[in-house]
UniProtKB/Swiss-Prot annotation:
InterPro entries: YcgL-like_sf, YcgL_dom. PANTHER family: PROTEIN YCGL. It comes from the Bacteria. This is YcgL domain-containing protein PSPTO_3921. Residues 3-87 form the YcgL domain. It holds the Pfam family YcgL.
């Protein structure tokens, strides 16, 4: 079965997206999630079906979540955050003098 879905991006976290049924808008998304997500920014609408492939999400999981809870939250890909948080002097230790 096909579903028309609206996809919103988070202003708080890069590459975090919220999928909702277009007909429901954001009505079924828990208020606590919206607080953590930030004010949703509409990215685009998409027709989803089991035959459609998504780049980073399992289409069956997305459709199941849309049916059961009314939304699907796509988390950002894992990063090597530890490198970004090291002090500058540690990052430069191996630089040539």
């Amino acid at each position: 079965m096909k579903r028309i879905c609206s996809i919103y991006r988070s202003p708080k976290r890069n590459e975090m997206y919220l999928y909702v049924l277009k007909s429901d808008v954001l009505k079924r998304v828990p208020p606590e999630l919206l607080v953590a997500f930030g004010k949703p920014v509409h990215a685009f609408d998409l027709v989803l079906s089991p035959e459609r492939a998504l780049s980073r999400e399992d289409i069956n999981a997305v459709l199941k979540n849309l049916d059961s809870q009314g939304y699907h939250l796509q988390m950002p890909p894992a990063e090597d955050e530890y490198i970004e948080h090291l002090p500058e002097e540690l990052l430069r230790r191996n630089d040539p003098m």
